[in-house]
Amino acid sequence: MRGPLCFTLIAIAVTSVVAHTTVYGVWINGVFQGDGRDVYIRSPPNNDPVKDITSSAMACNVNNSPVGTTLSVAGGDRFTFEWYHDNRDDDIIAASHLGPIAVYIAPTTSNGAGTVWTKIFEDVYNGTWATTRLISAHGQHTVVIPEVPAGDYLLRAEIAALHEAYSLYSQVPSKGTQFYISCAQIRVTSESASGSELSANTAFPGTYTDSTPGILWNVYDQDPTEYVAPGPDVWSGAPGGSISQVGSA
């Protein structure tokens, strides 16, 4: 006969299977750009997280290879990532996977290697976690394209799920913060205003370490208002962004 503990373990196992997420496509100024998987998104082969923060997969996940399409944008455009689990506009990510969302930018010529990334958006907790609001927004969150020099860039969206962040992956490989990462290829066609060079102060891997604030965190016991997301502050030249639905599937 199965007892309560057995059913609890089954529930945990099921949650771990159905919880994962990746980016399906993007919207530019409210217009959907079509299924972006392996088209303009450097899509991973599955929706599993990256947990080893020393891995090169921290840049653009495990399939960081150029794809055939680059999306044209201009400074000030609203660029919306749309995440999904198995099918577009499904459960997006498990409700238990609480954590922040960030977006970084780097020149495509770098392929994401080295200290080339600049954080241009971050949402952590404002009464509810960013991931909770992402589910309500049908997987959509927006970043405003900054006024940067014209050229090709990678836009890196990152979800850090903290439900197992009470242990470090380096010490307990079955646990650790789960990073869901996806990179889109963009071409900025507008010229920058003066003084808008990116800060380029972040490396993946490199910047996130076991001692970085936000990597080790007990989401069940600690005050969410005290949580500090990993990485630097958002770049001062970033115009902002939001977590809200811009369109329907």
Swiss-Prot record:
InterPro entries xref list: AA9 (IPR049892), AA9_LPMO (IPR005103)
Biotech exploitation of the protein: Lignocellulose is the most abundant polymeric composite on Earth and is a recalcitrant but promising renewable substrate for industrial biotechnology applications. Together with cellobiose dehydrogenases (CDHs) an enzymatic system capable of oxidative cellulose cleavage is formed, which increases the efficiency of cellulases and put LPMOs at focus of biofuel research.
Catalysed transformations (reactions): [(1->4)-beta-D-glucosyl]n+m + reduced acceptor + O2 = 4-dehydro-beta-D-glucosyl-[(1->4)-beta-D-glucosyl]n-1 + [(1->4)-beta-D-glucosyl]m + acceptor + H2O
Record EC number: 1.14.99.56
Gene3D superfamilies in the record: 2.70.50.70
UniProt-annotated location(s): Secreted
Keyword terms: Carbohydrate metabolism, Cellulose degradation, Copper, Disulfide bond, Metal-binding, Monooxygenase, Oxidoreductase, Polysaccharide degradation, Secreted, Signal
Family according to the record: Belongs to the polysaccharide monooxygenase AA9 family.
Protein name: AA9 family lytic polysaccharide monooxygenase A
